[in-house]
């Protein structure tokens, strides 16, 4: 009688955790392999793929129609003086407003600047 993969998986699914551990140990002994090495390689690759960006930069791409409102929004968000905020806004496109901030902070800053009429990117 030939057993297919699906039948084996069904049988393993009904086993307790301890039974599965014993099965793995028996398979390692019988075939002379180690499941730990394969698991470590698979887990290492998965960890790299799962890494998520945690720090974001907010970049002013365009000022829009209401330059004064954008300067006020930049001033409020960055704590810069009027002249520094004006110079920063006028350096758009690609004026980095804040670097290395959380996603929530970046989204909030983007929203406030877009409400003022600016075009903003989060990188």
Swiss-Prot record:
A GO MF term: mRNA binding
Gene Ontology BP term (one): translation
Gene Ontology, cellular component aspect: cytosolic large ribosomal subunit
CDD domains per UniProt: Ribosomal_L7_L12
HAMAP family, per the entry: Ribosomal_bL12
Oligomeric and partner information: Homodimer. Part of the ribosomal stalk of the 50S ribosomal subunit. Forms a multimeric L10(L12)X complex, where L10 forms an elongated spine to which 2 to 4 L12 dimers bind in a sequential fashion. Binds GTP-bound translation factors.
PANTHER family: 39S RIBOSOMAL PROTEIN L12 (PTHR45987), LARGE RIBOSOMAL SUBUNIT PROTEIN BL12M (PTHR45987:SF4)
Family from the record: Belongs to the bacterial ribosomal protein bL12 family.
Name recorded for this polypeptide: Large ribosomal subunit protein bL12
């Amino acid at each position: 009688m030939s057993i297919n993969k699906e039948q084996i998986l069904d049988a393993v699914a009904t086993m307790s955790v301890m039974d599965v551990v014993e099965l793995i140990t028996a398979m390692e002994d019988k075939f002379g392999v180690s499941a730990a090495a394969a698991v470590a390689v698979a887990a290492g690759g998965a960890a790299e793929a799962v890494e998520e960006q945690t720090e974001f930069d907010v970049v002013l791409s365009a000022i829009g129609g209401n330059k004064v409102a954008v300067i006020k929004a930049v001033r409020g968000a960055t704590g810069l003086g009027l002249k520094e905020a004006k110079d920063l806004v006028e350096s758009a496109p690609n004026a980095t407003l804040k670097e290395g901030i959380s996603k929530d902070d970046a989204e909030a800053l983007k929203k406030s600047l877009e409400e003022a009429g600016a075009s903003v990117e989060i990188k």
